Amino acid sequence: MYSKLKTEINESIKEALTKLRIKYDDEIILEEPPNPSMGDMSTNIAFSLASKLKKSPVEIAQEIKENIKLPLYFEKVETKGPYINFYINYTLFTTKVVNYIDKNYGELPEKDERILLEHTSANPNGPLHVGHLRNAILGDSLKRILQHAGYKVEAQYYVNDMGRQIAIIVWGMDKFNYTVDDDKKADHAIGEVYYKCNQQLEANPEYNQEIDDILRKYEEGTDAALIDAFQGVVEYCIDGIKETLKDLNIKMNLFKWESTFLRNGSVDDVLEKLQPFTIQKDILYLPLERYNVDKELVLRRSNGTSLYATRDLAYHQYKTKNSDISLDILGADHKLAAKQLGLALELSNNRAPEVVFYEFIDLPEGSMSTRKGVFISVDEFIEQSVEHAKEELIRRDLDLTEKQIEEVSKIVGVGSIRFYINQISPEKPITFKWEEALSFERGCASIQYAHARACKLLAKSDYNEFEEVRCDYELDDEEKDLIKTLSQFTEVICQSAQERRVHHLAQYTLSLSKAFNKFYKSKQVIGSEHEKLRLKLVDASRITLKNSLKLLGIKSPEFM
């Protein structure tokens, strides 16, 4: 709705320019003035026209203003020096906004484009650790936003079953009779076996040749028992990883195995397409100097086996055939590999993926011990967050039963992790701070609390969600701010989807909760002479907060 207001202003300015016989092809920039007394939207187009028209910006602004036909939802237009300021008619606009918002608010029309979004894709040799967390959360949140924006999105986890790590586990289980501990979560049990195997390799480096032999045999695909062993290890570990993803409210559409592309001939197919550009010496490689990439892309080892990059090319060829847009979520340390991959794909008449790169998460010293280099698993991290959330809920002495505290602790604990990561632009590194993540003033809990407040207020009232209301009074600043913020939801979804950036929506959601809390604290709702309209405003806030959190993969408790 807010974007519609912008469109109407743009059209009214263009009409005024036409009347004045002024040609202007550039984009008309609209901004929100720093002070509400200066209007709701403002443009400095007069500055841009000054040199062309050889007039002062103040004079130009006045001429444009005098020729503007005021759009429907605006009450006046004024000039302040060279700026043209527009003032929303909040009586009309509020009636429109509160009656428009329903449970589907923010959904955009269906688009034809199919997006194949790959994220997480951690090696199945142990549990997800904090290093994987940002990838998983950004990927899942982006999937939700893109779907809400009308795209058909499939989220895939690329299962690296052909990696050396899996061969090491299979080797150790066979050579030393290592077994998984059935009492432990599957991925953690596999991780322990992997650790034991690596200890053996460190003590006996000559064993590495045996690993090479196992990898070669698995790639040949003729040893059925070996294939079963690899698949058994990977499936067992992935089962544990799926549990962790579920705890984070993440659901994949498909787990696509790396070996699929070797077995079905896709690897040979992509190598054949690249043959005119490759060089065969001891190894097969693709030189990339002519594309300003110093490091060549190795495609086949001297023993004839393929590499991860080769199979990844085949996977991305599959993406090209099965989607209109390929979208990868990758750590910033993958920039060179992504560049090499993209060039190789284009040379083989395939499509290079769009890539969202992200920086990494640091844990502040002392918050969670890394136990001398041992990684922090996502399971441990979630457990810590839920425990912190529980302590905070108890400290606040909220009106909750013991069962409700347990339930809300899990919702707030997981939500706080997701929101803290989502609110920061992926280009920026994160230092995770519990006191900020779990803050009831500026963290996810503050948003969830605002939602619970709205639910409680509506439950105490005689609110009828199906009754349309009219605004028939002059709104205060808190109400105007809330109405304006509510109206911006769809525009923010568009921005997040187009830019592939989740933090726009996260930051908007926090702003909305702050606007609602200001309104809640300053205005009587039940029993006021404007009760029906204000209840409608409360419900519109509840819906928009809930929808916003859902797109960020966060649950909205109805009580806190």
UniProtKB/Swiss-Prot annotation:
Protein name per the record? Arginine--tRNA ligase
Q: Where in the cell is it found?
A: Cytoplasm
Family stated for the protein in its record: Belongs to the class-I aminoacyl-tRNA synthetase family.
- State the Gene3D superfamilies in the record: Arginyl tRNA synthetase N-terminal domain, HUPs, Isoleucyl-tRNA Synthetase, Domain 1
Motif 'HIGH' region positions after renumbering to this chain: 122-132
Q: Alphabetically list the UniProt keywords.
A: Aminoacyl-tRNA synthetase, ATP-binding, Cytoplasm, Ligase, Nucleotide-binding, Protein biosynthesis
UniProt-listed Enzyme Commission number(s):
6.1.1.19
Record-level GO BP terms: arginyl-tRNA aminoacylation
Q: What Gene Ontology molecular function terms does this protein carry?
A: arginine-tRNA ligase activity; ATP binding
Q: Name one GO cellular component term.
A: cytoplasm
